[in-house]
A protein has these predicted regions:
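Glycine-enriched alpha-helix->loop->beta-strand junction motifs that scaffold or abut catalytic
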Residues: 45, 97-106
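Glycine-rich, proline-tolerant flexible connector loops at the mouths of alpha/beta enzymes
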Residues: 50-68
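N-terminal amphipathic alpha-helix/helix-capping segment at the start of soluble metabolic enzymes
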Residues: 1-22
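Active-site mouth loops of central-metabolism enzymes
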Residues: 20-34, 62, 86-88
Length: 129
């Protein structure tokens, strides 16, 4: 029950006078790109900077993101702009790495939810307070 109460009120901590805005590139491709966009957004209504560093695909051989190196870029975004950060996670290792790099919000994309087993494994490295 306590988790449910926290989940219903987490937006209150932002003290926003506008809707929560999450923005950033679909794919983090270079450090320069990630930081440039973050600096453009920092003085806007954006509260959370998003960048996909792991890109689940329906077919192999397509661009699957820059991977864990992108987490360092998200850390720099937070340090240089003060924006909170978010990225998509698709497995338990992604979750652990994102937490280790202090990513603020993790999202689970549609391709990761098709398998109940995969979805369950995403929560294994975490324990909600």
């Amino acid at each position: 029950m306590e988790n449910n109460k926290k989940l219903r009120t987490w937006l209150d901590d932002f003290n926003l006078d506008h809707p929560l805005v999450i923005a950033g590139p679909c794919s983090a491709e270079t450090e320069k790109q990630v930081l440039s966009i973050a600096h453009e957004l920092k003085d806007s209504d954006v509260s959370i900077y998003r960048a996909g560093i792991w890109k689940p695909r329906t077919r192999p051989g397509m661009f699957e993101g820059v991977g864990a190196i992108g987490l360092k870029w998200l850390q720099k975004v937070k340090e240089e702009t003060g924006l909170l950060t978010t990225t998509e996670v698709a497995n338990a290792n992604h979750v652990k790495l994102a937490i280790d790099y202090d990513v603020d919000v993790l999202w689970i994309g549609a391709r990761s939810t098709v398998s109940p087993v995969s979805y369950t494994h995403l929560t294994l490295p975490t324990k909600l307070a």
